[in-house]
A protein has these predicted regions:
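N-terminal Rossmann-like NAD(P) cofactor-binding subdomain of oxidoreductases
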Residues: 2-203
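Short, intrinsically disordered, charge-balanced linker/junction segments flanking boundaries
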Residues: 206-212
Length: 212
């Protein structure tokens, strides 16, 4: 019997759309049943179809007032600010990918479970999560009986930890120093603009230099 994992995505931006494309390309038994994003549905469909980094999605993408269809698969689109108001149970979502970057505290991410989700995977470092997992490093530590709010760690950690694990297991690491080259994020500006961190107010001379 083939078990299909039904997934909802909260935050259909860079990470959310990348997850969608990865799930589609993997041919895994994953069904995206709904996404939640405050952006209008026409724009979401367009951004999913046309990506300046990954190129065009090689399937037709259409939409109506409350759903997007990719090829023959249709998923609901919600526009809720409060995770607790999302009706994940009504669309059968077992797992929610929390990729807004906003709800990284376990108490906030757990609000998805109010609407019916059984597990939440946060696509960033989190606070008070049940476990932080990096595939290929410590994913064997996952315990489905007690790990419901899961952090997938940071992009830097996912790049560094697998390599460090191999080096440490085979040769040993006493101490280390790393430099990361990071692309601009949604939080960084390319014009002078107010920012909660004063270093981040001034276009490319700002916080990008101090990110890591």
């Amino acid at each position: 019997m083939v078990i299909v994992v039904k997934v909802g995505i909260n935050g259909f931006g860079r990470i959310g759309r990348n997850f969608f494309r990865a799930a589609l390309a993997s041919n895994a038994n994953i069904e995206i049943v709904a996404v939640n994003d405050l952006t209008d549905i026409e724009t979401l469909a367009h951004l999913l179809k046309y990506d300046s980094i990954l190129g065009r999605l090689n399937l037709p993408v259409t939409h109506n007032e409350n759903s997007i269809t990719v090829g023959t698969k249709t998923f609901r689109v919600f526009a809720e600010k409060d995770p607790a108001a999302l009706p994940w149970g009504s669309v059968g979502a077992d797992i929610v990918i929390e990729s807004t970057g906003r709800f990284t505290k376990a108490s906030d991410a757990a609000k998805h479970m109010v609407g019916g989700a059984k597990k939440v995977v946060i696509s960033a470092p989190a606070t008070d999560e049940d476990v932080t997992l990096v595939l290929g490093v410590n994913d064997s530590a996952y315990d489905p009986a007690k790990h419901n709010i899961i952090s997938n760690a940071s992009c830097t950690t996912n790049c560094l930890a697998p390599m460090a694990k191999v080096l440490h297991e085979n040769f040993g690491i006493v101490r280390g120093f790393m430099t990361t080259v990071h692309a601009y994020t949604n939080d960084q500006v390319i014009l002078d603009f107010p920012h909660k961190d004063l270093r981040g107010m001034f276009h490319e001379e700002g916080i990008a230099h101090f990110m890591s």
